Amino acid sequence: MRQLQQDKDNAFDMEQHRDSVPEEVSGAIDAALEKNELTSQVKIAIDGVCGGGKTTLGEALALRYDCNLFHMDDFFLRGEQRTPERYAQAGGNVDYERFKEEVLDHLADDGGFTYRPFDCVTMELGEPCTVPYKRLNIIEGAYSCHPYFGDIYQVRFFAELSPEEQRARILARNGEEKYKRFVNEWIPMENKYFDAYRIWEKCIRISIT
């Protein structure tokens, strides 16, 4: 009986999560799906600031739509890539080359494909993930609109957040010690990328509560 109730609660949470998608987001995606022919793929990017709700939105969309969801966090730099020269690049704090080679270049493969997400525990590439062909593909995370990928997206979103709300969310999610790394490392690198390429200018700007 307890397991049955837990299953019901989980189903309710999933339904609530799916219905939490902002109308401006679902409307833009629905329009892109209608505009493109049934045989063509639709690619959606969710870029934006740390703590902006990109992952939460991506997961909600994956519950609502028949799609693939990819996380840019699965493409952290490997140890040998973490050099001063790499970090000096605007947008260099992600393995954008591998993401393009392993994911973007294969989205149209009829038989699907595999890629290896980065494992933050072992700091190595993890076991291969098998991905089926889907018409709709959603890529969430900072650097998802990196110009290295070209003009590939039908819709781009940019998640915005005030510095005060960003601080509160990161502290609640990651704690004080991890927050220091965000402030000293990750947020400055993201801001450098945003400013260098003016990422928000090609995006629908959204605030996710």
Where do the language-model regions lie?
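Charged, amphipathic alpha-helical linker segments immediately N-terminal to NTP-binding catalytic cores
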Residues: M1-E23
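P-loop (Walker A) phosphate-binding loop of NTP-binding proteins
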Residues: V49
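Conserved lysine of the Walker
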Residues: K54
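Hydrophobic positions on the alpha1 helix immediately C-terminal to the Walker A/P-loop
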Residues: L57
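Short beta-strand-centered segment that lines the nucleotide-binding/catalytic pocket of NTP-utilizing
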Residues: Y65-E80
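Conserved nucleotide-sensing/catalytic segment adjacent to the nucleotide-binding pocket
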Residues: Q81-G126, L136
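ATP-dependent NMP and nucleoside kinases share a basic, alpha-helical "lid"
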Residues: E124-R173
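Small-molecule kinase domains that catalyze NTP-dependent phosphoryl transfer to phosphate-bearing small molecules
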Residues: H146, G175-T209
